[in-house]
From Swiss-Prot:
Disulfide bonds: none annotated. This is Nucleoredoxin-like protein 2. One of its GO terms (biological process) is visual perception. It holds the Pfam family Thioredoxin_8. The gene is NXNL2. Belongs to the nucleoredoxin family. May be involved in the maintenance of both the function and the viability of sensory neurons, including photoreceptors and olfactory neurons.
Amino acid sequence: MVDILGERHLVTCKGATVEAEAALQNKVVALYFAAARCAPSRDFTPLLCDFYTALVAEARRPAPFEVVFVSADGSSQEMLDFMRELHGAWLALPFHDPYRHELRKRYNVTAIPKLVIVKQNGEVITNKGRKQIRERGLACFQDWVEAADIFQNFSV
């Protein structure tokens, strides 16, 4: 993810800071554009949380997958509350990082929630991640891994 997040830092729902490059290396990355005040975001986030948990947190062998939340919330407190209430143990771009706006433009985010699945170089695998998870569940992940050119023996 050097190409799109570079030397940036990401945060956890507990407030810890991690280096984006180390946290996202050799993983399929889902950029999750959402906000607490958005009813469709509040509806989809628990489903994404279950998807993430099944692939990463509770898996015998964690999948090469990470979600990066790109908040459209009105304040850092609103973002943090949303993360603590409904999110999985995934990462987020800090609220005060202006790069949030650049990512929205780069990935043509005109409505939320939107889940954009990207390769390590930032190239889009699909901008319909939300729809694919709703329709296909865990089965869509294998397609993402193959498209991401991550050579790892993984099966759902």
